[in-house]
Amino acid sequence: MQKQIGIILKSASLGIACLCCICCSENKTQDFQIIRFDKDLYRYLTENAPDSILKDHTDFLDVFGEGVLSIGKSDSTGFFSRLKEYFSEPTLMGIYKDEQEKFTDMTDINKELSKGLHIFLQQFPQIKPPKVYMHVSGFFQNVVVTDDILSLSADKYLGSDYPVYQDYFYEFQRELMSCDRIVPDYLSGFMMANLPFFGNEDVLLDRILYEGKLRYILSKLLPKRKVWEYIGYDEEQYEWCDLHQSQIWNTIIENHHLFTPDYFSTSQYLKDAPHTAYLPADAPGKVGIWLGFRIISAYMEQKPKTTWIELMENTDYQEILKQSKYKPQ
């Protein structure tokens, strides 16, 4: 089991145009219930069950084996032996057992996730509805996305105070490893894969407005959540940004960070970290994402008839900023 934080396997496609009508029809009736691959694999590993117990998950098993565990596809020689060997590590199996005990009733998660996916796919009918899975990886990817699969590694959502996490993750990372992050992370991963970034990665304005677009859409997919949850903040972190809006903005402008292509300075405002560089020590991390969300929210207030497709396709980031009429308080 390696010490590494989650990443997202992204699909570069926005969907296949010829499937548009099919997808629109499916969106009206499809029930996005999470397929518990994690449960079947646990039974396979602990009950000496035959390989056939996983036969219903062949498509995902290939993604899981090749893309997550790097042990090859399910039809490769020795695949199931390698699978058992990977999960033979005692600490990992202890985590797996805890995951199975924690996630017994998925009713609320299924309900919230299904509603969010339905809303998203109604707004982006060209995107293919996914099969939704749950798996355990040993702290690898948080979310895995392919053209037709969406899966989340549940062993990374056992609670910020889960003892094993202290050996593998920093405190600021553990704060986002609770079960209430499952649905936002499913949806965020799916959006990032299907709505990729277009712009200059070195320019802060481009990056924060893209992130702001995703957070704005997430806020509409999960309308009952607290506003700080869309960013991955707690209430105190969000309020700090609110109280220091002018300081955040002035720091960015005075340091010429908003428009100047500079990957290093841009990344400081976006990365998960205990705090954001250039700002006081009590500033939370990823302040750029908070700012992008604020600007896009202001823009959509000014342009309420803008569809989500139009929002995502608009890459004139300076014009978006201008039309948002954003003014820090």
Where in the sequence are the language-model features?
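Acidic/His-rich structured neighborhood in mature extracellular/periplasmic domains
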Residues: 84-238, 313
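Bacterial N-terminal signal peptides that target proteins for export
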Residues: 2-13
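N-terminal mature-domain "stem" immediately C-terminal to a signal peptide or N-terminal signal-anchor/transmembrane
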Residues: 25-90
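C-terminal motif of bacterial Sec signal peptides marking the signal peptidase cleavage site
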Residues: 20-23
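Acidic/His/Gly-enriched intrinsically disordered linker/tail segments
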Residues: 215-276
